[in-house]
Regions:
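Rossmann-like NAD(P)(H) cofactor-binding subdomain of soluble oxidoreductases
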Residues: 1-26, 31-37, 43
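Short, flexible loop segments at boundaries between secondary-structure elements
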Residues: 39-51
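Long, compositionally biased stretches enriched for glycine and/or charged residues
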Residues: 48-308
């Protein structure tokens, strides 16, 4: 804002939904675009299922919150409806298509892709984001989780270790010769976004933006993940219209969690954070929410403000 007021900040920071809500309130005049590559990664899988060369052959309609959304329409550029074929696959196998890339995935991802079929069953009119399993299939997720070795441990022992070890090797060698990095959705998406801003391409992209009526029957202030056309003036959100009661109810509850979390940080409020955790569909009761909160405070006391 002070030194480069015309610059765009492309923000991948997690937890993306809460960070987006915080930037909306605390930095309303900054040119921040909040993004997540999860929908893009899933669209790559969808394109593979549909035997397309690229996800960019698809025109998608999608709405929701970050890690909390649904595809309502997917066509090719000629207008052919691709949803029936995709739904038939997801109904039987989720997003678990046997490919070379799939074979190299961690087991937790394979389980996640397969569980999408159970999430899909709740609304066969759409296809879901995989992360909805945490909000709709909580018992099953907990039952198959190892509290001694969580998803975070898996990431630290695999992707994070590989990246850091490679970076250390390059530094020690003084050269990147002989090293290779795979370019995935995380990298290509942010480059596509930067190019759209720089060259006014008007590319259609899924971004996290203020609703402002795009979803007509939803909180206008909520940060929603919807298609936008991106050019040199930034994102232009596309109208979604009215959404079904099932998704609306889920999203309203989750937005309340996100807003209360930001309230808690701004006000240093123990009560607001307890309320946020109690509202989360990943937490079964207020009593357990309080226990989780107290353990989170202890684990993060070096980083969190003091709550009262």
């Amino acid at each position: 804002e002070k030194y480069s007021p015309d610059a765009w900040m492309l923000n991948y920071s997690n937890p993306a939904a809460i960070v987006a809500e915080a930037t909306r309130r605390l930095r309303p005049n900054s040119r921040i675009i909040n993004i997540c590559d999860m929908p893009v990664a899933l669209e790559n899988i969808m394109a593979n299922i549909l035997n397309l060369e690229s996800r960019k052959e698809m025109i998608v309609k999608y709405y929701g919150l970050n890690h909390f959304g649904w595809w309502t329409s997917i066509t090719d550029k000629a207008g052919k409806d691709l949803m029936p074929e995709l739904k038939a696959f997801v109904k039987e196998k989720g997003y678990a298509k046997e490919t070379e890339d799939y074979q190299h995935r961690a087991q937790s991802w394979k389980d996640t892709y397969l569980m999408a079929k159970d999430v899909y069953a709740l609304d066969p009119e759409t296809v879901p984001n995989t992360y909805l399993k945490y909000y709709l299939l909580q018992d099953e997720v907990v039952e198959h989780s190892n509290k001694e070795y969580t998803r975070a441990n898996e990431v630290m022992d695999s992707r994070e270790k590989e990246v850091f070890d490679t970076a250390k090797g390059i530094i020690e060698k003084g050269s990147a010769e002989g090293y290779t990095f795979a370019v995935g959705a995380h990298a290509t998406f942010i480059v596509d976004l930067a190019c759209a801003l720089a060259f006014n391409t008007k590319e259609r992209m899924l971004l996290i933006v203020p609703n402002n009526g795009a979803i007509s029957n939803f909180d206008p202030e909520a940060m929603v993940e919807i298609p936008c056309l991106v050019g040199s003036n930034g994102p232009e959100p596309l109208a979604v219209g009215k959404i079904p009661e099932f998704q609306k109810g889920l999203m309203e509850q989750q937005v309340a969690v996100e807003k209360l979390t930001v309230d808690a940080w701004m006000e240093h409020s123990y009560l607001k954070l307890w309320q946020a955790l109690t509202l989360s569909k990943t937490v079964p009761s207020a009593k357990i929410a309080k226990k989780i909160l107290d353990e989170l405070i202890e684990a993060n006391k070096e980083y969190w403000p003091e709550l009262s």
